Amino acid sequence: MAFHSLLLLCLAGLAFVSETAAVHHEGEHSKCPLMVKVLDAVRGRPAVNVDVKVFKKTEEQTWELFAAGKTNDNGEIHELTTDDKFGEGLYKVEFDTISYWKALGVSPFHEYADVVFTANDAGHRHYTIAALLSPYSFSTTAIVSNPTE
């Protein structure tokens, strides 16, 4: 039974990640250089109103706030940054999971889910960071693509 639950969880994650391709901004077909998508694994739908912060590691080895946002009705945040501002570096995406679950009346285990990654070290890329949340676990994945794809 646990295997089937894990399998369904993985399939749900694949389904929502596969839909994170291009988005439409003001009628134009484009992609954001950094996009976040969050899914509530318990309810099987997008996680709405999740606070997300993006930090960039400084030369002094401290984390500096780079961008912030809140997931929309599709569990997504677009336009966190621009191609010009999103340079090479070490970034951390912080999902405020405790506030999300407490707003639903659930007491979760994790306060935050963090994803730390190096961006644009092999040339300019676009990144989709996807998170699948439950009160006692989380899973993340990333899609890294060339801006022209």
UniProtKB/Swiss-Prot annotation:
Residues modified to Sulfocysteine: C32
Main location: secreted
Residues annotated to bind L-thyroxine: K37, E76, S139
Chain ranges passing through the membrane: none
Gene Ontology terms: biological process: purine nucleobase metabolic process
Cleavable signal peptide: 1-20
GO cellular component annotations of the record: extracellular space
Modified residues (4-carboxyglutamate): E64
Pfam families hit by this protein: Transthyretin
Modifications made to the protein after synthesis: Sulfonation of the reactive cysteine Cys-32 enhances the stability of the native conformation of TTR, avoiding misassembly of the protein leading to amyloid formation.
UniProt GO MF annotations: hormone activity; thyroid hormone binding
InterPro entries found in the cross-reference section: Thyroxine_BS, Transthyretin/HIU_hydrolase, Transthyretin/HIU_hydrolase_d, Transthyretin/HIU_hydrolase_sf, Transthyretin_CS
Localization per record: Secreted
Top-level taxon: Eukaryota
UniProt keyword list: Gamma-carboxyglutamic acid, Hormone, Secreted, Signal, Sulfation, Thyroid hormone, Transport
Family under the similarity heading: Belongs to the transthyretin family.
Subunit structure: Homotetramer. Dimer of dimers. In the homotetramer, subunits assemble around a central channel that can accommodate two ligand molecules. Interacts with RBP4.
Role played: Thyroid hormone-binding protein. Probably transports thyroxine from the bloodstream to the brain.
Protein name: Transthyretin
